[in-house]
Design a protein with these regions (language model features):
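Conserved glycine(s) of the Walker
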Residues: 35-38
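Helicase-associated low-complexity regulatory tails and linkers flanking the ATPase motor
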Residues: 1-25, 40, 44-827, 831-1001
Length: 1001
């Protein structure tokens, strides 16, 4: 797996970091603005430092420490870390890394070894008992230590804890095999581990005595829970310490730790152990911190009064760590103090002096910090941020009915923010206020207000009949307007985002939705993502599946399968319409048909013209084929189509070819242009296993088109609801009209350069299974039946849940799917934990359901989609002169090359890959959507956030930022003059603007 190549400003930053290391400045902060590719720079730094060490070091070791396993796996490819070295959730614990380190070293790493790690930052080594995998590995190593030869069973019981014996033994066997293989490969794993254990026990003899005493007890499992837990945690700490000692890195990269003070404060956490080892004890190890916000970038006066600490204290703490030298620290504090004093007295008449002081402070900071920013925001459309959400009768009723219930139960005021954030609150919320309501109702026994309410709870009966569920919430209605294009263009009929540069025009639902984008929603409340996922997906299903029910067979069509008629229930459970030979029609990558359609040769035509030309070629092919094979006309069947394609390729057919049915030319034309397998074959045609890879990817499309919601879409568009034989033909037509080849080619371009197999893996990971969320309905709340579940497919929720292997994998699957052209089209999330994750490939709409309290949090949210080659960049360039046909080989590479030549001029590569010039004729922009109610405080809060964002960079490292902001505001400064006071730490900008302070624009 190769790392991605850095662009010019990234290369300049990597060179600067290397220069600092050579000057013995071993601690460097890379604080590029969110979304500018800090990981790519880190990869370049790795290579440069490795080349530097090659003169005296025969093995270069890099430890990449990431705060989040999803971020780690996302960034492995960018760093060039082999897939086999990337982390599984179950093995991400620090105490398990000793085995991974030796396994990795045993592979053919030649000179350089990269070791990814994700410490459980919220997990204290003094609490819990660790994971079953963690304890199994400890036993698999420790039972080989001579002291425990006579205590195998009690040691196993101690570490088994409360895990099922059958699976416990299986886990131990698996690790025993890996240990034996690792020892055979390296020759020294077990001997090194035994030596390390001996050293530890010599330093902690009382701990060894305690473990042995436990093992001597007749019934280990009967010992007090606390004693066993403390013993297990002691063993975990021991193996974590051994892992740390075995790392011995030449370079440590710490990625996306948002608060440096939290990183170094953890006494017993895995992060704390790592921090002490690499940030405090080993002063000579090279450390690169990657974080746009290692300190709170902006503190309000309210935050300062609450905590006593804020931006200034955190900023100085980071700078003191980076300097790591008393003389350097003293010099920085003195220079920064002078700068702060002049800035606090900011006056237009003192401008020249202030610029000089700023330059001195900037130069001092540049000794250990690099930061590039993109200050141009021309690609942002903020018009929807000021649009007011209409207050409806239903909004008011949602509040009044809940407040009446609260009054009747003497429970005080119902939180108005909850009502503004979600409808049907008792269906979705799991907060304390609901518990109070439930408890009070159970005691009182009077449920009349709940029974009479139309807004507190969803009704299962209405959902089951696919009735329209009123939004009852202005914010949800705003989202529906965006996601479903106000029901004008049929966005609910899309299974993938229309190609930014289609190869031909159609009059289909895809052309009607040209420019359509996914929507990312941020909320402060955990209930909101679940509500959005459930109700938005239901609405999409109502507009498709429900439409079929309205058209025919309405009495049988039900949302909940168990309530459907017998025939409908069997149909849903058993029938997948693409199966057997009907599936093979769309999964066979016919090489002969692939040659009949070359997208760039027939580009920029109507689909009818493309079909006519390709159909002519198919007719010529079949005419010649009939003459040589003496075939007769037969009835159309999928088996005959598969046999014909295989015979055309010179392959042994899977079915006997009896003849060619009338109309086969039209079907083969559709397949040549849009078959998932044939489109995938064209994508992979340079690979040695192109056919196999194409079939592999096409299988994912079969699963997609066999989903209930997909089948409904095809039936709504093409009819033939009950004809499975016609279904595969309709699917092929849908793929043609959806410009599937252009969609796959664009998607491949966004995924970057890796190998064909890596591209296939990433594309396959972009299809996510339909999941469901549990909700309370009126019927379940009143005790009439169990809770119900809403399917989520058009929209999904991404929110804090119990962190385990299953939820982490689901989270990663959702991220991959949202970053693909395929569903889901709406992702709703809480802000927490999303730092560093990309959501930009097909999303240019961001909706702030609730405004954050800090202006920088808003910038961080939007950095999820304002990134390299984001959807808005591609859509604009594709629709410009740079995306005009003809092209020679690659639409997207040539589009970017044309744009670079015309637009870059004296700018860095931020243009055109991240930004476009202010005078670019934008047709598509990143849309900031803030659904605010009229007369609410949200408008004032939003205006203040915008004011602060415009100049907060000027308050960097200042003790009372909000007061300074007010001072600047009153002076009525010219914005161009203020920008010259911004701290410039960009190596590219400083080199290309003679050390001045001009920023990339």
């Amino acid at each position: 797996m190769s790392a991605l190549k850095p662009l010019d400003f990234q290369e300049a930053t990597a060179n600067r970091i290397l220069e600092l290391y050579q000057q013995k400045q071993y601690r460097v902060l890379l604080a590029d603005e969110v979304g500018l590719g800090k990981t790519i720079i880190a990869s370049a730094v790795i290579q440069k430092v490795a080349d530097l060490h090659a003169a005296w070091d025969d093995h270069f070791k890099v430890v990449y420490i990431c705060s989040n396993i999803n971020i780690a796996n996302q960034n492995c490819r960018k760093l060039g870390i082999p897939e086999e070295d990337c982390l599984d959730f179950q093995e991400s614990r620090l105490s398990m890394q000793h085995l991974r380190i030796y396994e990795s070293a045993g592979r053919d790493h030649s000179y350089m070894q990269l070791i990814p790690m994700t410490p459980a930052t919220s997990f204290s080594m003094t609490g819990g008992q660790g994971s079953k995998h963690e304890r199994a590995l400890i036993y698999a190593v420790l039972h080989r230590y001579p002291v425990f030869e006579s205590y195998q069973d009690p040691l196993k019981q101690l570490l088994q804890y409360e895990h099922t014996l059958q699976w416990w033994d299986w886990n131990i066997d698996e690790y025993n095999k890996r240990i034996d293989e690792c020892d055979a490969e390296t020759g020294n794993y077990l001997s090194d581990m035994m030596d390390a254990i001996s050293r530890y026990f010599k330093l902690e003899p009382a701990f060894l005595d305690e473990i042995l005493d436990i093992c001597k007890q007749p019934e280990v499992m009967e010992l007090p829970h606390r004693r066993r837990r403390e013993a297990v945690n002691g063993l975990r700490r021991m193996f974590a310490s051994i892992s740390l000692d075995r790392l011995k890195p030449d370079l440590v990269i710490m990625d996306e730790f948002q608060r440096f003070k939290d990183l170094i404060a953890g006494d017993n956490s895995e992060s704390g152990m790592l921090a002490r080892k690499f940030l405090i004890e080993d002063n000579d190890v090279k450390v690169l911190l990657l974080s746009a916000t290692p300190y709170k970038p902006y503190s309000t006066l309210e935050e300062l009064s609450e905590t006593g600490e804020g931006h200034y204290q955190e900023f100085m703490q980071v700078m003191d760590f980076l300097m790591n030298d008393d003389q350097k620290k003293h010099q920085f504090h003195q220079v920064w103090s002078d700068y702060s004093r002049h800035l606090a007295e900011i006056k237009t008449e003192h401008y020249t002096v202030l610029v000089a002081e700023k330059t001195r402070a900037e130069d001092e900071m540049y000794r250990c910090v690099c930061r590039t920013e993109r200050l141009s925001d021309a690609i942002f459309d903020r018009s929807k941020a000021t649009e007011m959400t209409e207050i409806t009768t239903e909004d008011i009723r949602s509040y009044t009915e809940l407040q009446m219930l609260m009054d009747s139960l003497s429970l005080g005021k119902f939180p108005i923010e909850y009502v503004k954030s979600a409808p049907y609150l008792l269906s979705f919320m799991n907060y304390r206020v609901k518990d109070k309501i439930v408890d009070a109702l159970e005691k009182q026994g009077d449920y009349r207000l709940v029974e009479q309410s139309t807004s507190m709870l969803l009704r299962r009966t209405r959902i089951n009949r696919y009735e329209k569920i009123p939004c009852n919430n202005g914010r949800l209605q705003t989202l529906f307007n965006e996601a479903f294009s106000r029901e004008r263009n049929g966005a609910e009929l899309l299974l993938w985002i229309p190609a930014s540069r289609p190869y031909y025009s159609t009059k289909s639902v895809f052309d009607k939705n040209k420019g359509y984008s996914k929507t990312l929603v941020f909320s402060s409340w955990e209930m909101v993502p679940r509500m959005i996922a459930g109700l938005t997906s239901y609405e999409a299903e109502r507009l498709t599946v429900g439409r079929l029910g309205n058209r025919e067979d309405a009495k049988q069509m039900r949302y909940f399968a168990q309530d459907s008629s017998e025939g409908e229930r069997k149909r849903r459970k058993v029938v997948v319409r693409l199966r057997d030979e009907m599936e093979e029609v769309l999964t066979y990558p016919c090489r002969t048909l692939a040659k009949l359609y070359e997208p760039l040769e027939l580009a920029d035509r109507s689909v009818d013209e493309v079909r006519r030309i390709v159909c002519g070629r198919v007719q010529e092919l079949l005419q010649e084929f009939r003459q040589t094979h003496q075939l007769h006309a037969v009835r159309q069947s999928a088996a005959q189509v598969v046999a014909l394609m295989q015979t055309l390729d010179g392959e042994e057919p899977s079915y006997e070819l009896k003849g060619i049915a009338a109309g086969t030319e039209k079907l083969l034309t559709e397949l040549a242009i849009g078959s998932p397998a044939i489109c995938a074959y064209r994508l992979f045609k340079g690979a040695s296993m192109a056919g196999t890879m194409a079939m592999d990817l096409a299988d994912k499309f079969i699963a997609l088109f066999n989903k209930q919601e997909s089948m409904a879409i095809i039936d709504v568009l093409y009819g033939n609801k009950d004809s499975d034989e016609a279904y595969y033909w309709n699917v092929a037509s849908y793929c043609v009209e959806g410009n599937l080849q252009a969609v796959l080619d664009e998607y491949a371009f966004t995924l970057g350069g890796g190998s064909d197999l890596e591209l296939l893996r990433q594309m396959k990971s972009s299809f996510v299974d339909t999941a469901s969320i549990q909700i309370e309905t009126r019927e379940s709340f009143l005790g009439h039946r169990e809770k119900s579940r809403l399917r989520t497919h058009f929209a999904v929720g991404y929110f804090n849940a119990q962190v385990n292997e299953k939820t982490m994998q689901r989270t990663e699957n959702i991220r991959s799917a949202f970053n693909s052209p395929f569903r889901p089209f709406v992702l709703a999330t809480t802000s927490i934990g999303q730092e560093g994750l990309d959501f930009h490939n097909y999303c240019r709409k961001i909706m702030h359901w609730n405004l954050p309290s800090n202006p920088i949090d808003l910038e961080q949210r939007e950095g999820r989609i304002n990134r390299y080659l984001c959807h808005a960049i591609r859509q604009n360039l594709a629709d410009s002169e740079f995306g005009a046909f003809p092209f020679e080989k690659s639409v997207w590479k040539e589009t970017m090359d044309r744009a670079t030549v015309a637009l870059k001029q004296n700018h860095s590569d931020l243009i055109p890959y991240w930004c476009l010039p202010d005078d670019f004729p934008f047709k598509y922009k990143i849309e900031r959507i803030v659904p605010m109610y009229p007369y609410s405080q949200d408008r004032c809060r939003y205006d203040h956030l915008m004011d602060v964002l415009s100049v907060y960079r000027l308050t960097l490292g200042q003790p009372r930022q909000e007061e300074l902001f007010e001072t600047i505001h009153k002076e009525n400064w010219n914005m161009d003059e203020l920008k010259k006071l911004y701290i410039n730490l960009s190596p590219w900008n400083r080199a290309h603007h003679n050390g001045g302070t001009e920023h990339e624009d």
